[in-house]
A protein has these predicted regions:
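Conserved P-loop
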Residues: 1-54, 61
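P-loop NTPase motor core
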Residues: 53-134
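A generic alpha-helix structural signal
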Residues: 41, 90, 188-191
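Conserved, well-folded catalytic cores of nucleic-acid-processing
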Residues: 43, 62-65, 96, 138, ...
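A generic structural signal for alpha->beta connector loops
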Residues: 12-15, 99, 139
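Phosphate-binding/switch region of NTP-binding enzymes
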Residues: 102-181
């Protein structure tokens, strides 16, 4: 939990007790420091085979919070280090066990491409993340939340493919539709079924 906030559902504290030295069996960890996140991921990878899914919520705050902690520094070095730290966590996940699904949740932002077209992309800090790394390019699957007003109120979905105005992507036959229910369990189950 990068943003160090309560989870948005009833009973989360009992379902996800805090992971720390006193409780190594915990299932909830809060940190916005990339090397601490890496330590936690490595611990789960090596010592917690019963954990099959990790959700890193509000991942962009690893970048935003480091930027704010270093706001008084001048020059481009801090942006390089922020980008390198974010890149390192994502790259480390690629080397983890195959039965482990790691979900990075991030906010999106609307930018404009060279032709003036609107593009929705993952929110990042600094041009290096956008122009050199291109964060979404590091993932096989990128889903975007879609919110529409329906007959029963607000309806939440995931967009699974690029519609020309976002960087969403997934193997074309994985989800069977461009729009799917906003349900992480459904997503995890579908990915597992597709990969096996």
């Amino acid at each position: 939990n990068v943003a160090r906030k309560a989870l948005p559902f009833r009973g989360w504290k009992s379902k996800y007790p805090v992971f720390n030295k006193e409780n190594p069996d915990g299932r909830f960890h809060s940190s916005d420091v990339p090397h601490e996140i890496l330590k936690c991921l490595n611990y789960i990878n090596e010592k917690r085979p019963e954990i099959k899914t990790i959700v890193i919520d509000d991942y962009q705050y690893t970048m935003a919070n480091e930027y704010m902690r270093r706001a008084n520094e001048t020059g481009f070095k801090k942006f390089t280090e922020i980008a390198q730290n974010a890149w390192s966590v994502i790259n480390a996940v690629k080397a983890m066990r195959e039965d482990l699904l790691v979900v990075f949740m991030m906010h999106s932002e609307v930018t404009f491409d060279a032709h003036g077209n609107k593009v929705t992309k993952a929110k990042t800090i600094g041009k290096m993340m956008d122009n050199v790394v291109t964060l979404e390019g590091m993932f096989t699957i990128v889903l975007y939340t879609d919110v529409t007003k329906g007959e029963n109120g607000m309806e939440y979905s995931f967009i699974t493919q690029n519609d020309g105005a976002n960087t969403g992507k997934a193997p074309k036959d994985m989800f069977g539709s461009v729009k799917i229910p906003n349900d992480l369990k459904l997503v995890a189950d579908t990915i597992e079924e597709y990969n096996n």
